[in-house]
Amino acid sequence: MSTNINPDAASASSTRDNPCYGGDPNVASVNVYADDEHCYLLPYAQLLYAEMIPNPAQEKNADAPPEKLAICFAAAEVTVLGTGLQAVARKIQKYELNFVKAVDRRFTASLKTHVAAVAVKFTRQTS
């Protein structure tokens, strides 16, 4: 069992140890490292759906990441931008996504899945 809690410490060259996302078949929530430097722990029990579409920002900016993955929870929507996001979607489908975070653009060439940006928007307040 790995005790490494820092996703940056993972090897960028291995598809199994991608610093953008991690998997664990025994998790009950996903740890979202957002670009606002906050970390959000969102429970799979509140997962509503995930949707992957082409990133609409590419129409105006050719350098924008080509894919957009929206992960919708009961009280929050996580937006992930990047390339090869189908691997992240497969982890969500199996409730195995442990964490997701953006990594520097310099890793793009060495990764099949690269997360360029992560944002969390709360859709309603919970009490």
What is each PLM-predicted segment?
Residues 77-127:
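Helix-rich interaction surfaces within compact, conserved domain-sized segments
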Residues 30, 50, 118-120:
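Generic beta-strand hydrophobic packing signal
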Residues 1-25:
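Anionic N-terminal interaction surfaces
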Residues 57-87:
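Short, surface-exposed polybasic-and-hydrophobic patches located at secondary-structure transitions
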Residues 42-58:
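Phosphoinositide-dependent membrane-docking surfaces
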Residues 26-41:
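Short aromatic-glycine motifs in intrinsically disordered, low-complexity regions
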